[in-house]
Design a protein with these regions (language model features):
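Conserved Radical SAM active-site core
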Residues: 2-5, 18, 36-96, 100-113
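N-terminal [4Fe-4S]-dependent radical SAM core
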Residues: 1-23, 32, 36-42, 156-157, ...
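Short Gly/Pro-enriched loop/turn and capping motifs at secondary-structure junctions
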Residues: 101-103, 125-128
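Short, hinge-like loop/turn segments at secondary-structure boundaries
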Residues: 112-115, 138-140
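P-loop/Walker A phosphate-binding loop and immediately adjacent motor/lid segment at beta-alpha junctions
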Residues: 75-84, 90, 130-165
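Conserved C-terminal portion of the radical SAM core fold
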Residues: 61-68, 93, 121-127, 151-165
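Receiver (REC) domain switch/active-site residues of two-component response regulators
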Residues: 118
Length: 165
């Protein structure tokens, strides 16, 4: 089960191309200037099963998937289960936004989720580093990480670091 605040279909702001973005409840980072402070409460939204979420994802054949929130890493076990199902039944790519740094994701559930992701946008939003020209992130401390390459190489490998708008 995942506690979900909202699902946006065919959005284009949470990664490249059209995406189905799943916004979860719960975040302890509480970054000043957060664009989604209503997501901080862990009891917000409603619980949804992997099957319910997978149906929504499959029913949008052209959209890839983004996990956001809140912070999906607080519900890593549920998102890992969903990501495994997405991998099994689709060829969609999976992005995830988190306020945690990649290097701090050491809980077994978080590592299991990481193994299913294509890209992780990591780090807290820092208002003094806000930059509207950054693609797919709000502040310059946040990184867009190629997760499979990073796990393979044992260090952070950035995803297409030359990208800007």
């Amino acid at each position: 089960m995942i506690r979900v605040l909202d699902i946006l279909e065919d959005t284009m702001v949470d990664g490249p191309g059209f995406r189905t973005s799943i916004y979860c409840a719960g975040c302890n980072h509480q970054c000043p200037g957060c664009h989604n402070p209503q997501s901080w409460a862990f009891d917000g939204g409603c619980e949804m099963t992997t099957e319910q979420l997978l149906k929504i994802i499959i029913d949008d054949p052209f959209a890839n998937v983004t996990f956001s929130g809140g912070d999906p890493m607080y519900q890593a076990a549920g998102f890992a289960e969903l990501a495994r199902a997405i991998r099994e039944y689709t060829n969609k790519d999976i992005w995830c936004f988190t306020g945690f740094r990649f290097e701090s994701l050491i809980h077994p559930d978080q590592l299991e989720l990481l193994e299913q992701l294509d890209v992780l946008v990591d780090g807290p939003f820092i208002e003094s580093l806000k930059d509207p020209d950054l693609l797919f992130r709000g502040s310059s401390n946040q990184r867009i990480i190629d997760v499979p390459k990073s796990l393979y190489e044992g260090k952070v490998v950035l995803w297409r670091e030359d990208i800007s708008i």
